[in-house]
């Protein structure tokens, strides 16, 4: 926690503002604690790195104080309590489309990307998590590898598809998101998180 306010209280204040704006977000929140002395050290490192690589040196802040302390929150939008996933995903793409910077004076920055007003078109019946596990087992069964796969979480989400930039519209499809921890058989201490998506009606890999 930062001196000006506990992290939980800061997020509570942010949530209240988002509610007033009609922005529904997940409770799965990432928070970076931006403490002024740490930011000062990181700035010095960035300048030293730029000098070493002979690249453009970033402009240094005159002085870092407690007034610069802030929380940087990241999360994603939901609709009818289900996460809405962006159309482009994977390595290099961030699923968190809502970000907020909050300091002792309140919200300093709030952004939401890739948002589409949503309306109910039709209801669908989704397959059970048990069927998803079977599909996941088959999926990894087709991979020739000695790696170890551990299912961390399976959650029902909605994925943006068929984006029409001209009409500023898109459709969403229900998907099961499977978070799997992959442990490298050759490097026991090396592991990474893999996300696999199945269409929640057809179990087709997306």
Describe each PLM feature range.
Residues 68-70, 93-95, 171-175, 191:
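A general secondary-structure signal for short beta-strands and their flanking turns/coil
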Residues 23-24, 142-145, 187:
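Intrinsically disordered or highly flexible coil/loop and linker segments, enriched in small
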Residues 75-82, 157-159, 179-183:
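Generic short beta-strand segments
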Residues 14, 100, 176-182, 203:
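Conserved histidines in hydrophobic membrane contexts and catalytic metal-binding motifs
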Residues 1-89:
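Preferential activation on post-signal-peptide N-terminal prodomains/segments
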Residues 90-172:
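Charged, low-complexity helical/coil segments in non-catalytic cytosolic or luminal regions
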Residues 169-173, 183-187:
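Accessory, solvent-exposed terminal regions and/or long lumenal/extracellular loops of proteins
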Residues 86-112, 186-206:
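A short, surface-exposed beta-strand/turn
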